[in-house]
Amino acid sequence: MAFAIAGTLAFLAVSSPALANSSAAEYFRNRANSTNVPELLSNSDKDWYKTLFAAIDSEDWPTVQQMFADRPDGPLHHFARAEYYLDPKSPKVDLDQIQAWLANGVDLPQADQIIQLGLKRGLENPPDLPSQQMLVSQSYAPKRTLPRSVDDGTMPDSIANAIKQKIVADDPDGARVLLDGIDANLSPEARAEWRQRVAWSYYIENQDAQALAMAQTVPVNGAGAWVAEGYWAAGLAAWRLNEFGQAADSFRNASLSSQNPELTAAAYYWASRALIRSRQPEKAAEQLRGAAQLDETLYGMLAREQLGERLPREDRGPDFDLTDWKRLREVPNVRTAVALSEIGRDDDADTVLRYEAKIGDPSEYDSLSRLARELGLPSTQLWMAHNVPIGAKAERALRFPAPRWKPVNGWQVDPALAYAHALQESNFRTSAVSPAQARGLMQITPITVREHAPRLNMSASYVNLSDPGTNLAFGQENLEMLRDAPATGGLLPKIMAAYNAGLTPVTRWNTQVNDEGDPLLYMESIPYWETRSYVAIVMRNYWMYERQAGGASDSRKALAQGMWPTFPELSGTGAVRLSVNDAPVSVRP
């Protein structure tokens, strides 16, 4: 990229007058330290079962057998025996043991496997299993994603790959020449895609006039989801050319043709901005209200902020309470899941609660989902958010699950920010491993372990990144390191970008991205699509977690005012305004 911002970027830090982020931090820290679920196990029970399950996990069968002999019954024995019997390396289980297990109930998720094992041992007349109700799939929270590439055979792979290579090599002119040679043979859908890709290549090279001209061809004899992306590219290019009337028209067309809620809201919001710049404020409010209707999107929340409208309270679901417990306390699987959670067997508790959701009374579903949240089981919350009985409706808060985990060194950053990253990085899967060997909740890389282990008084060779507390500790250390890096300047959008792409690209983008000191323009002009999407998604996640805490959002206020939100400290968030060429800097009072 040949462009470099002339002059310097002047900035002034402004501390936030309201410590909204501190209320979110306090909310999530308090959740980790208190619960409305009664304890079912005594301390001695917890110690005993931890020892028993550790013996099963380590295949210490003599210890397992002795412990069952010494204590033949207890609240988690039925589950523990199922784990013991079904382990492929455990001693052979005879028919009498299987029949005794089945006589104690078949509500556990292992019951079918136990019956199958019994049939191999000569079991006759096996008991009926509970019937499973139909669960209806629910929609996912919207994400800013590109349309799928058109694969209809009209674009030869060789030319597609050659165009991509030109784009990667920062050669949009070369990509354009290749496209011109095949354009007439493409389907309308493929034509829209490849014209948009070339237009975007011009845009990220800061060749805005060429980007606008190319983007305007996308809807001409083009069709499909890529048309909206073409209008979007045209809008951004026109914006940077100060052609705000053209930008407004392009953004409005993008909002009308978009098939993605996040892009739709973004287009409405940017149309409003462009109309203000083109001195048509009477038309801007209508566009802003269009964005505000999509209140679970990044720009929908920004629009609500700018309009001064309160966000719906439904995103902070009701807490688990005594009424819920009275409804569930006699359900065997509920008691099993609660007890498993008490001894740290979250994966097992997750399995049991999911199974209960399938076999239980549909009227218990709401209470069951609130129990999953109260126990801090993120995987269960996500699953229940997207699988509900007929006639039920999942609370939206479940799509942004709140665990009860905390870093081994205590919270140093806003938990809402850590959860926002973890949701996008791993979907809260503690065992997630990427092709680059990034591991766990916050996808910690080997180099991150080596860099931060000494500060955490850990040996890099013996770090268990599958442990949530350990992984969160490394994640927040990484966030603080990025906060302090000169490349980010402590600015939240750049910190998020660096978490995904690394500091080297962010350093390069500081001079290559023509953002005009505008944080939203920066976010929309990040050259890497993955990082551009990542920043939008994580920022949205962060605001959704702040909504759960019931407080305002300093970072959302800052962006709505055209300011850069800074890293959210536990005491609150500041904001800065950047200007190009040392122009005067206005600040928020």
List where the protein language model places each region.
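Solenoid-like repeat scaffolds
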Residues: 34-41, 65-75, 85-89, 100-108, ...
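Compositionally biased, proline/threonine/alanine/serine-rich low-complexity intrinsically disordered stretches
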Residues: 19-41, 127-156, 165-169, 564-589
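Catalytic glycan-binding domains that act on GlcNAc-containing polysaccharides
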Residues: 82-86, 95-108, 117, 188-192, ...
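Alpha-helical tetratricopeptide repeat
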Residues: 42-52, 81-82, 156-163, 193-196, ...
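Alpha-helical, heptad-rich or low-complexity scaffold/stalk segments
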Residues: 21, 29-123, 127, 132, ...
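Cleavable N-terminal signal peptides
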Residues: 7-8, 18
